[in-house]
């Protein structure tokens, strides 16, 4: 049995974290899996443990146990996950004098990361200095790989492995959708536009709500659905100031949710307004659920979904309105037909089984 240690920045709700969860679920019992996370409340802890993995938050005891394991099993795979996770994995590797096979995975856009704070810029430059140490570095897109090379990353084995999802989880669940629609008091004939994601400047919720305001005034059958941490209407009062109370009642804020497949089952048009994304797992999940999607033109896989994915320039809320209306004016049957074609493409290119096989091949070949 091969010991596999994931060192992750966190295991809370997020794209990189959900990929880790899906990857661990998919790996076979050839691997004895241990997950160490640095920050957060550990949202996915119970789900990860249910797979048989051991899960620890970083502390002196878990650190000592991991060091002891590396000394005892020097062929352990040491897989970093996100910047801080990569640093932790490297720290363990150096502390044990090179024991373990060190790998990194980079999930974020460097350009976006360095502009968040000086601390993030320093972390990026520091990881660039250490980037020769891993046996290989995985990036989630070719664009992210090129970005990090421009910031000084150097390694003989830099590979792109796309994020994958368990496509079976996102099959449309009409029964669950009906229950949610009923609980939210949304008419069955409504067109539902929605998004999923925490409130963060990169997500650009201002553009989302600017366009929502225009759309909801123009289309009385439109309802807006938002599932994400720290999103509340008071933060966007300027964008929504012209709406009546009836129109505001058609905006539904659900907060942070774990039942994303069920929520996507009732969304007709999924919108991504992010100004920077390394991959956007939420968009792939929406496509896997058969949603028609509108996104900023920063996504590298738009060519795979010519009908189901329409793009607009970042910040351009008026273009976003036109893109959404393209799908509003379609019949439900037309949207469903487009959605079914998108599902087949996701299954072909972005399944978790393909991602898992790519990682297993990497760990065994380098």
For each feature predicted by the language model, list its residue ranges.
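Short hydrophobic beta-strand element within catalytic cores of glycosyltransferases
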Residues: 37, 292-295
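Short, structured helix-loop element that forms part of the nucleotide-activated donor/catalytic region
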Residues: 41-49, 225-249
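Aromatic "clamp/platform" in nucleotide-sugar-dependent glycosyltransferases that forms part
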Residues: 256, 275
């Amino acid at each position: 049995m091969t010991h596999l240690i994931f060192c992750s920045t966190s295991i809370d709700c997020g794209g990189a974290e959900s990929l880790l969860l899906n990857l661990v679920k998919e790996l076979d019992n050839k691997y004895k899996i241990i997950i160490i996370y640095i920050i957060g409340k550990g949202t996915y802890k119970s789900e990860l443990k249910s797979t048989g993995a051991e899960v620890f938050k970083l502390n002196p005891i878990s650190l000592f146990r991991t060091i002891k394991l590396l000394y005892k099993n020097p062929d352990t795979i040491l897989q970093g996950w996100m910047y801080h996770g990569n640093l932790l994995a490297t720290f363990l590797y150096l502390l044990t004098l090179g024991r373990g096979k060190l790998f990194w995975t980079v999930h974020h856009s460097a350009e976006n990361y360095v502009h968040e704070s000086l601390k993030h810029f320093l972390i990026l430059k520091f990881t660039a200095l250490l980037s020769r140490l891993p046996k290989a570095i995985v990036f989630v897109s070719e664009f992210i790989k090129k970005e990090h090379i421009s910031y000084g990353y150097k390694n003989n084995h830099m590979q792109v492995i796309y994020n994958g999802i368990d496509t079976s989880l996102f099959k449309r669940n009409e029964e669950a959708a009906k229950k949610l629609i009923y609980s939210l008091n949304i008419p069955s004939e409504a067109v539902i536009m929605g998004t999923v994601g925490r409130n963060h400047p990169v997500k650009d919720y201002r553009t989302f709500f600017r366009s929502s305001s225009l759309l909801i005034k123009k289309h009385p059958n439109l309802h807006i659905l938002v599932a994400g941490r720290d999103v509340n209407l008071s933060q966007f009062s300027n964008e929504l100031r012209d709406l009546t109370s009836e129109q505001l009642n058609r905006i539904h804020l659900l907060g942070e949710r774990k039942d994303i497949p069920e929520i996507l089952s009732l969304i007709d048009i999924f919108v991504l307004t992010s100004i920077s994304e390394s991959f956007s797992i939420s968009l792939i999940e929406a496509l896997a659920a058969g949603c028609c999607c509108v996104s900023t033109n920063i996504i590298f896989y738009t060519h795979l979904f010519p009908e189901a994915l329409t793009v607009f320039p970042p910040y351009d809320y008026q273009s976003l309105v036109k893109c959404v209306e393209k799908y509003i004016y379609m019949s439900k049957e037309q949207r469903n037909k487009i959605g079914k074609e998108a599902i087949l493409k996701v299954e072909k290119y972005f399944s978790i089984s393909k991602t898992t096989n790519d990682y297993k091949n990497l760990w065994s070949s380098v």
